[in-house]
UniProtKB/Swiss-Prot annotation:
PANTHER family in alphabetical order: ATP-DEPENDENT PROTEASE SUBUNIT HSLV, METALLOPROTEASE TLDD
The protein's name: ATP-dependent protease subunit HslV
GO cellular component term of the entry, any: HslUV protease complex
Active site feature: T7
Organism of provenance: Cupriavidus taiwanensis (strain DSM 17343 / BCRC 17206 / CCUG 44338 / CIP 107171 / LMG 19424 / R1) (Ralstonia taiwanensis (strain LMG 19424))
Gene: hslV
Keywords: Allosteric enzyme, Cytoplasm, Hydrolase, Metal-binding, Protease, Sodium, Threonine protease
Length: 178
């Protein structure tokens, strides 16, 4: 059976604000199965934002594990992400998971990759998923040439990705932290 795939998740940080957004499309092969999925969430009492791309079941499995790590490390995003990455690399079942996460709190944005890497993106911009390159390019241009708020940059970047990537729609969920 084919895997569910395709989405765009993008995060932008400027000053004391961070925004994380994603589209709502879930695709199975060349069929849109759902257009209103919620791939961006607030976790850890609303203090951490997380967005996921990749296989839906795998992403939920990772999200559950990440939430447990946040609890274990009392909300320390970096320690939770690194510990999740260690598990991801060393556990046979986890190594097979096909998903990626972007996580953000008030101070830090991290990308947790399908290889178990934890990346701190440059320039306050991170994007993943099938439309990630489009969204990241758009966000970078907007951040360098406008004074738009992070939420507005995320919305415009997702709109552009939705126009270019067939696996991305324009039903957005955008969350912010200040």
């Amino acid at each position: 059976m084919e895997q569910y795939h395709g989405t765009t998740i993008v995060s932008v940080r400027r000053g004391n604000q961070v925004a994380l957004g994603g589209d709502g499309q879930v695709t199975l092969g060349n069929i849109v199965m759902k257009g209103t999925a919620r791939k961006v969430r607030r976790i850890y009492n609303g203090k951490v934002l997380v967005g996921f791309a990749g296989s839906t079941a795998d992403a939920f499995s990772l999200l559950d594990r990440f939430e447990a790590k946040l609890e274990k490390y009392q909300g320390n995003l970096t320690r939770a992400a690194v510990d999740l990455a260690k598990d991801w690399r060393s556990d046979r079942a986890l190594r097979r998971l096909e998903a990626m996460l972007i996580t953000a709190d008030r101070d830090t944005t991290l990308v947790i990759t399908g290889n178990g890497d934890v990346l701190d993106p440059e320039g306050g911009i991170a994007a993943i998923g099938s439309g990630g390159a489009y969204a990241q390019s758009a966000a970078k241009a907007l951040m360098e040439n406008t004074e738009m708020a992070p939420k507005d940059v995320v919305e415009k970047a997702l709109t552009i990705a939705g126009e270019l990537c067939i696996y991305t729609n324009t039903n957005f969920v955008i969350e912010t932290l200040e």
